[in-house]
Amino acid sequence: MKKILALLMIFAVSLSLFACGKADGDGKENTTVNTAAVDKTEDTSAEVTTAAEMKKGDEGNGPADINAEFITFKLPSGYKYKVDSFSKDSNNPLYGDVTLYIYKDGSYSSIATLTATARNMVRSQEEAVENTIKLCNLQTYKNGESEIGEDAQYGENTYSTVHVTTEYYEKDFFVTYANRGASDTKGLLVKFEINNKNIKADDPFIKELLDSLKIVMA
């Protein structure tokens, strides 16, 4: 009889605990919620801009991953960009052109212009440099002084450096040209232009951006 009463008491206690919820080690109801799935962690990932959504007038802040389909690069934190123009060949996504203005945060004047285009009349690195100097002269309607410096290696690309001085401005250019295979009849000209009034050619920002720039091969 005592054994039966003891079993009934144990059974009653078990039912009581089950009704009140699972007890923790102190005999208190465990009300802890697993917050791993609901906590929001700070988003530190880079903004992503792709060719599918890129259009004139688009802008954004670094850090940002820019993908124009025929080139990609990373814009560091502390800078912003604005798309001046973008287009691509519907039959070949590696053919197209893009021009972006780059600004320091809080500044209204661009410090640099990045241009990549397959719509050009050049077929080599040397012609790319000549084309850059010629365009500078045409834009100012007056011949300036151009000095071709030593080549510079950034990331996967070798850039010719050009320093241009005119009556109106002083600029540095980093110019590279890529032929992307036997089927590439146009090649890609990439030109990074900086305004010396706002940034110098040895600024760490330039290395950081150009180190990240990749030309997409066919």
Task: Give the predicted meaning of each segment.
Residues E69-E126:
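Secretory pathway targeting signatures of secreted, lumenal, and periplasmic proteins
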Residues D58-D65, L94-T99, Q153-H163:
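Short, hydrophobic/aromatic-rich segments at coil-to-beta transitions
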Residues I4-A6, S16-T41:
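Bacterial lipoprotein signal-peptidase II cleavage site
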Residues V33-S77:
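N-terminal low-complexity, Pro/Thr/Ser-rich intrinsically disordered segments
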Residues N131-S183:
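Signature of long, low-cysteine stretches enriched in small and polar/charged residues
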Residues L75, Q125-T132, D202-L209:
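Stable alpha-helical elements in mature extracytoplasmic
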Residues Y79, L188-A218:
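Surface-exposed amphipathic alpha-helical segments
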Residues F11-A12:
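Repetitive helical segments and hydrophobic/amphipathic motifs
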